[in-house]
């Protein structure tokens, strides 16, 4: 009798003060796809509620939340504080695993990809950068996570 692996569904999240980039992947397939962005809510609670709706709609089992670790040890940004609180709010609101994943320079890398490789203007890059950054975060997690079988 075969033992099929149960598929896990991941949501990659690149949290920003104005927009939140989103990416999606199903494991074991393991391909991250950008799915757009949403506007950040007026409060963290409102933002969590928006994300919970997406989590439920897509039947997400694991959220990979980009965590902007500081370049220098010992520093913590206001954005990082918001992300830690958002992580707690998501875990309180729905039965989902939230993993904080190093996202340093993911937005800068996404910006370079869209500007250089795709040649998109600044106006056309708006919003796309966030979802590409979320895809980079999720791809990094899927490629490097010790939690997933190879």
From Swiss-Prot:
Q: Is Protease given among the entry's keywords?
A: no
**E.C. number, please?**
3.1.-.-
Keyword Hydrolase set for record: yes
Q: Belongs to which family?
A: Belongs to the YqgF nuclease family.
A biological process (GO) of this protein is: rRNA 5'-end processing
Please state where this protein is localized: Cytoplasm
Principal cellular location given in the protein's record: cytoplasm
UniProt keyword annotations, A-Z? Cytoplasm, Hydrolase, Nuclease, Ribosome biogenesis
Alphabetical GO CC annotations of the entry are: cytosol
Q: Which GO terms describe its molecular function?
A: nuclease activity
What is the role of this chain? Could be a nuclease involved in processing of the 5'-end of pre-16S rRNA.
PANTHER family, sorted:
POLYNUCLEOTIDYL TRANSFERASE, RIBONUCLEASE H-LIKE SUPERFAMILY PROTEIN (PTHR33317:SF4)
Protein name as catalogued: Putative pre-16S rRNA nuclease
InterPro entries, per database record: RNaseH-like_sf, YqgF, YqgF/RNaseH-like_dom, YqgF/RNaseH-like_dom_sf
**Gene3D superfamilies per UniProt:** YqgF/RNase H-like domain
Q: Where is the organism placed in the taxonomic lineage, from the top?
A: Bacteria, Pseudomonadati, Chlamydiota, Chlamydiia, Chlamydiales
Q: Which organism is it from?
A: Chlamydia abortus (strain DSM 27085 / S26/3) (Chlamydophila abortus)
């Amino acid at each position: 009798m075969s033992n099929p692996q149960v598929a896990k569904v991941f949501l990659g999240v690149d949290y920003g003060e104005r927009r939140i980039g989103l990416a999606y992947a199903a494991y074991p397939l393991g391909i991250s796809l950008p799915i757009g962005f949403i506007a950040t809510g007026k409060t963290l609670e409102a933002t969590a509620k928006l994300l919970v709706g997406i989590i439920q709609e897509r039947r997400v089992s694991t959220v990979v939340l980009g965590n902007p670790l500081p370049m220098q040890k010992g520093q913590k940004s206001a954005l990082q504080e918001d992300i830690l609180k958002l992580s707690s709010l998501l875990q309180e609101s729905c039965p989902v695993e939230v993993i904080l994943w190093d996202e340093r320079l993911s937005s800068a890398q996404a910006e370079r990809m869209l500007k250089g490789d795709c040649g998109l203007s600044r106006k056309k890059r708006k919003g796309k950068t966030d979802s590409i950054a979320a895809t980079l975060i999720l791809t990094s997690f899927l490629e490097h996570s010790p939690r997933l079988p190879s």
